[in-house]
Amino acid sequence: MSCVHNNTSFPVQTEAYLKEVFEKYKELQESKDTSLTARFARALKYYQFLIYTAFSDPKFGIGQGENTRGLLIYHQMGMGKTILSLSLAISLSHIYNPILIAPKSLHSNFQQSLLKLIKLLYPETTDHSKELQKISRRFRFVSLDAYNMGQQIIKAGGSLNGCLLIVDEAHNLFRGIINSANDKTNARQLYNNIMQAKNIRILFLTGTPCSKDPFEMVPCFNMLSGRILLPLHYERFYTAYVNKTTNSPLNADKLLNRLVGMISYAGNQNELNKLFPTELPLIIEKVEMSPEQYRQYLLARDVENAEKHASSGMYEKINAAALCLPGSEQESGSSYYVRSRMISIFASEMLTVKEDEKLSEAVQQLPKEAFTENSSPKIVCMLKNIKTSPGPVLIYSQFVELGLHVVARFLEIEGYQCLQPLKVLEEGHNTILLHKDGKDLMVKNFAEDGPTHTLVLSSKITRFTLITGKILSKERDMIQQLWNSPLNIHGEVIKILLVSKTGAEGLDLKYGRQVHILEPYWDKAREDQVKARIIRIGSHDALPPEEKTVQPFLYIAVANQKMFYSIPEGSQEQKTIDERFHERGLEKSHLNSAFRDLLKRAAIECAFNGESGCLMCQPTNALLFHENFERDLRLPNPCQPLVKAEVKAYSISYEGKQFFYQKNKDVGLGYTFYEYNPIIKAYIEIKPSNPLYIKLIKHVQAGTTA
């Protein structure tokens, strides 16, 4: 069976196909079949196996030929997108050259996931190293954040022709494309290369599409379709598909028609939700700035306002270029209110940065007296909350020097010890075992051709550590292994982990009980991504039921009330930058969430999973959309809702085939006929325009009914 996605029959054909695949999955789960397909059925979750089969099956055709070139794998964070993509890469590597594009910090994640997958595929084998090396040689890695990404792609495969392209954290690519002011950026060059590539298959992995703006959908689905499926200009996209008055999607039915067949979604199913820990309601701590902090904050706001006024009007008459968000031309010069946002976290009169001195060094040289509630009410509030946590704690800040490093100094002053992996153990075999020995913890690291290194960690000391974008991958891996050790269930080895945006990407953490987000961001998906580092499938399985919860906190700096009311009326800013970012994020989140709901409705598994609002059309074999989006908006919607019902009908045999019919006065010629569709395993109506319709009428009227 070959399905073409621009066809009203595609949704029902896909639903029927996935039902067959699911039955096959259940059979293979219990079988002793040693074929590769059977091994994958036993290694993968059912929702992964559905996509694995649909994408790799040459007869069905997802991501092939007229069925577009790939899929947006929109699976809830922590559900195994990496394992799914590696499964497809292994199965298709004899046809396509797998190229994996991801931030450099995540490359080791793929290697770890590959080893995990190999162990699942070949549980009867004890030594998986040879198979790992054999399969690893087929893959080529490219760093999404590298300055020479284009050169890396050429080195990896010469071009993207004939490649299976896997892009992890794909939302970063989409945002990079629409934030580009020209075609010289890495993201824009990759977009152009993908659009020009021949015989390419694509997997975009993300748990948060449309995180910044619905316009992110444009580069995503243009690349997946291999043509200009959605309008390139921001204004035209918004005119066609966004109702600015209601802050909601416009012409949603027409947009759904264009997207069907390019999305896989998994995340709402009740049986899957049971595998996650419970996320408790967000606690928002509105923390009043100290007088000195608020004074410095107001000075920073004066500078930012002056910069804003100096540049105002420079871009007002410039319409956004193709694939550009409005204002992307000047975004690189914007401060994003960095000064005031950092001061909202920490402000000290003692902090001075000398010439040629790094900010982080200046923070380290500050005396203990600089780290008080007066300099950072936010951090002091956070530390009080952390002391209530019965298990490991994750802290996130976008800011490293005046965010995470300041928190680290506060923790050291409170008696916490910083654990730095490379100072703990020399590099070894990447295998870490932890053993309890009385009141101490012994960490052992086995070198391949050398001695075993051991460090005794006192269980009386509470430790923290940091993962930022500057940390080496081997350090990052070691920290993750220590955190996920069975002996760290309640934070005995690492109680607190501090992460930045780059550092948090791809982390797969267990046992976490609290998440602290030190400052709000206008992109609420960022907060979801941070929480998803510890809210994952199976992450809390080792804990008793009452401990399978995660409490998130968000800290918002508000004005010092006494000083605020002393400012002349009319000169005050009614809301702090923290408050404005939070409110803007909620407003933008409403629109982005509505578009993400559309993606779920267009997902190929939607009807199979029994979700509501799925795109399901009467299978008339008509085109779902016109290639010209403006003309498409003017045409009637060819997708007529599919209604399944039992009806009383008479049987008729004609030319060796069975049909059913009803006498219906409301129909022009007085009859409604039905024929069996083996693809969807149901009877569908024969339209009066079908030549068979007249023949059946004559057959009935001739009195030859069965």
UniProtKB/Swiss-Prot annotation:
Residues 62-227 form the Helicase ATP-binding domain. Induction: Expressed in the late phase of the viral replicative cycle. Its main location: virion. GO terms for biological process: DNA repair; DNA-templated transcription termination; replication fork processing. It is found in: Virion. InterPro entries: Helicase_ATP-bd, Helicase_C-like, P-loop_NTPase, SNF2-like_sf, SNF2_N. It comes from the Viruses. This is Termination factor NPH-I homolog. It comes from African swine fever virus (isolate Tick/South Africa/Pretoriuskop Pr4/1996) (ASFV).
